[in-house]
Amino acid sequence: MVTEFDIRIKEIMEAITAAGYEPYSQLYGYITTGKDEYITRRDNAREKIKTLNWLQLKEFVEKMDPN
């Protein structure tokens, strides 16, 4: 089942990639600092990420960890 979170995070990751950045690095920076500057404004990604549940986002990024 596709959730609202799944839809939003996909849109955010696509915007980050389209802006020329690597999604994991940017999302990791955002969750570790809380600074929204890590998220591009492209396609409203910065506003969209603010609507996501913080714990759900943190779990998602932890699962993405390439290490």
Role assignments for model-derived ranges:
Residues 1-67:
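Intrinsically disordered, low-complexity, basic-enriched segments
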